[in-house]
Amino acid sequence: MYKRQASGFKDERIIGIRMSTRPDYINKEILEQCVEFGVKTIELGVQSASNRVLELNRRGHVFEDVIRAAEMIKSFGIELGLQMMLGMYGSDPETDIETCRKIIELEPKCTRIYPTLVLSGTALESLYIRGEYIPYTLETAVSTAKRCLLMFRKAGVEVIRIGLYPGEDLRSEGNIVAGPFHSAFGELVENAVYKDKIEEEIIQKRLRDCDYEIIAPSSETSKIIGQKKCNKEYFFKKYGVRIKVKNRLG
């Protein structure tokens, strides 16, 4: 059925077919079919580069499977996407940063960064109830995601999503038991990036009790000011600096 659907997409000149799968599902025959039916991008759920973390979370694959699958995908001329999860059972911020480094070494076209949430009815919920798993706080998740985002950008890897899509299934009552969920998680990460940049400028220029104008596209204004103007308030309270954003086209 999926082959027929993909073939129909190709016939209609839809050229952007994107697929997501496990790294241990990739083989030569599957990739040949993907090429035949016009698949442009394959994303792999890496989750972690630590085999210990993968085993603890019963992922059913090791990081060597990711390396093998990534190289095969690229050898077929298909764009590679890699997805990582922050704060998995058995992980910590430095382990997550190492996962980011190893993902960069595989030279993907794009990546996604997801925080781990404790969902109702899962094995992770049982670990959480027993006190064996402590999820990241929102602050830790944002801080770690920020570090990964900056590393990916420096390496030229496009980050196409930060945070889980807040759909109805995820947000249904009682579904999220614990963890760093925020409907605008990606925006919080971008806020943190701008906060660091602006604070560095304020310190370097020794700004105090003054207006500080930032020229930026209108699309960046909310990221600079922060959720509920948190960045703006932070700089005024700490330095007496009043952030003002002047929009330019772009």
Can you annotate each of these PLM segments?
Residues 3-116, 120-140:
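Conserved non-cysteine loop/helix-boundary elements of the Radical SAM core domain that shape
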Residues 1, 30-38, 49, 177-182, ...:
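Short, charged low-complexity intrinsically disordered segments located at boundaries
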Residues 123, 130-250:
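Auxiliary Fe-S-binding modules of radical SAM enzymes
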